[in-house]
Each structure stands twice: as structure tokens, then as C-alpha cells.
A protein has these predicted regions:
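Intracellular signaling interfaces of 7-transmembrane GPCRs
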Residues: 35-49, 110-134, 190-219, 241-253, ...
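Hydrophobic residues within alpha-helical transmembrane segments
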Residues: 53-56, 93, 137-140, 180, ...
Length: 310
């Protein structure tokens, strides 16, 4: 029992040794695969455009979050403790990128519900022009929503850590997290994932072609991804809020901290696992990735122009 608690304690007090290295590895592995999201053919439908924005924000989130933590652990350079600018901007970008990522996830599931609907009015709501406007509005609102982070986050003179110095925001933060980046997206994606499957069973012949059926599979796999790797973290946040005022012994605190660390690690899989989900669920995605990689490796060739002889 003592050995188990000692191991758990090590994990809880050294989370970066586990989650940062694994997360950075996943980032590097998925970087090549996600390049396919920038191909023109994957930007012409609402769902794939949501996937594009989702992939970009996930990459940026992992780069900003994990790189700074790895530098802090590996080289002892923690800019959040020494630079007030980085303390504020890091929190700012993390909050807006996570909001955009989760919102694009559930918007893609809503779009697939519209696409598979038997009602023409609902199918018309899947419109690329409206999608561009929604994404623009989402980015604008997310940037405005993150502004308080630039004001209230400061380096504590006591602990020398980058912390929130506003009591009201400390109350708002877990509520926001549960609503917009935890339970909210999970419930919406599960609901519309079920409705999409229901539409498919009710409709013998889909209006869309095979590529759209593959998009449906990709979206449903997204539902599984967020349900498996984000929902447990959401439940743990609720548990922490409920038991916040309770008196806990050292062993319980060690176990709770280790569980929180492990579940936080699982959320990194959400940010880095989308490429693998797309590769598993879509043969077209796999084929396009393969073609794109091999095309990059082929040198450009110029065919000589033969002049007609007189």
C-alpha cells in the first residue's frame, strides 16, 4: 500500500514528466497527417471546414501548452514565473483555442444531422457561406471572451506562479469549463450523433454521396473521442467542486491529484487524436494523405516543348 501511494504521489507531483512527453510525441506524429486538412477538396463543405479549423486550433493548443511546459521541466526555464506577458498571453491563447476547438467539434456533428435529415429546410442549413460566417463569429467571440485573462492573471509575489487574482473569475472559470469545454460539447455531440444515426436508419438512400457518408463516420468517431477522453475529466471537475469544502487526509489528496493528472493527460488525446480518428474512419482521408505525401516527395518535372520542324 505504501509503495502504491508513493508511486501515485510521484505521478501527481510530476505530471509534466508523463503528459508533456507523451503529448509532444502525439503532436509530432499527427502533424504530418493533419496537413491533409489544408487540401482544397477538404474545404468545400461545412463539416470539413469545421474539421479544418478544429485541426488548426488543436495544433496551436498543443504547441503553446506543451512546448512551454517541456521547456520548463527539461531546462528549468518557466516563463510563466518570470514573464508577466507570457503569463497572460499563454492563458489567453489556451482559453480561446480550446473554446474554438470544442465548438467546431459539436458544430460538425450538428452539420451532419442537417445533412442526413429528410427535411429539405434542415438540409439547406448546411451551407458553406453560413459556416464561414459562424466560424468568423466564433473566433471573434472567443478572442473577446479571453480578454479578462490578459487582465486578471498575474505572477504571485508569494508563490511566484501565474495565477488568477480575481475571485469572481475563479467562480466563473469551472462553470465555463463544464459548460463550454466539458459537459456541454460532450452532450451536444452525443445527442446529435444519435440523431444522425437515427436519420440514417430512417432514410434508405442518403441525399449525399459516399464521401458524405465517410464524413458522417468521421463525425461519429469524433463523438466517441470526446465522450471517452473528455467526459471523465468533466466528471472529475464536478467531483472537485462538490468536495471542495471537505476535509481530506493526505492519502486521499494524493489519490485525487493523481487521478486529476491522469484525466488531464487523457484530454490531450482529444487534441492530438483527431488525425488518427480520421485515418481510421475514412478510406478517402487515408488515400489523400498517402497521395499528398508521395506527391511532395516527387520532384517537379518540366517537359520540353518540341518545336515543329520546317
Amino acid at each position: 500500500m505504501f509503495i502504491d501511494l508513493a508511486l501515485i504521489y510521484y505521478v501527481s507531483v510530476n505530471p509534466a514528466d508523463w503528459d508533456d512527453c507523451i503529448g509532444q510525441l502525439l503532436t509530432e506524429l499527427t502533424g504530418v497527417g493533419r496537413l491533409v486538412c489544408f487540401i482544397d477538396t477538404y474545404r468545400k463543405t461545412p463539416c470539413t471546414f469545421y474539421f479544418l479549423i478544429y485541426s488548426i486550433t488543436n495544433i496551436l493548443y498543443l504547441i503553446i501548452n506543451l512546448t512551454s511546459r517541456i521547456v520548463s521541466v527539461g531546462y528549468g526555464i518557466d516563463l510563466t514565473r518570470t514573464s508577466i506577458i507570457w503569463c497572460k498571453t499563454r492563458q489567453y491563447f489556451l482559453i480561446i483555442l480550446s473554446l474554438i476547438s470544442f465548438t467546431c467539434s459539436w458544430l460538425s456533428s450538428v452539420d451532419q444531422y442537417f445533412v442526413t435529415s429528410r427535411h429539405a429546410n434542415l438540409r439547406r442549413m448546411s451551407n458553406i457561406k453560413w459556416t464561414h460566417r459562424i466560424v468568423f463569429l466564433l473566433i471573434l467571440v472567443s478572442c473577446l471572451h479571453g480578454i479578462p485573462c490578459l487582465i486578471i492573471f498575474n505572477i504571485s509575489s508569494i508563490t511566484n506562479q501565474c495565477i488568477n487574482s480575481n475571485i469572481i473569475y475563479a467562480i466563473y472559470s469551472p462553470i465555463y469549463s463544464l459548460t463550454f469545454t466539458c459537459f456541454g460539447p460532450s452532450l451536444i455531440m452525443i445527442l446529435f450523433g444519435y440523431l444522425t444515426i437515427r436519420n440514417i436508419h430512417l432514410t434508405r438512400v442518403l441525399v449525399q454521396q459516399h464521401i458524405d457518408r465517410q464524413l458522417i463516420k468521421m463525425t461519429l468517431f469524433q463523438v466517441i473521442l470526446i465522450a471517452v477522453f473528455v467526459t471523465p475529466y468533466s466528471i472529475n471537475v464536478v467531483y472537485i467542486l462538490i468536495t471542495n469544502g471537505m476535509i481530506k487526509d493526505t492519502n486521499r489528496l494524493i489519490i485525487e491529484n493523481s487521478i486529476f493528472t491522469i484525466l488531464t493527460l487523457l484530454t490531450y488525446v482529444y487534441y492530438s487524436g483527431s488525425c488518427y480518428i480520421f485515418l481510421i474512419s475514412s478510406s478517402r482521408f487515408r488515400r489523400t494523405v498517402k497521395e499528398k505525401i508521395f506527391n511532395w516527395r516527387k520532384p517537379n518535372q518540366i517537359n520540353p516543348i518540341q518545336q515543329p520542324t520546317i
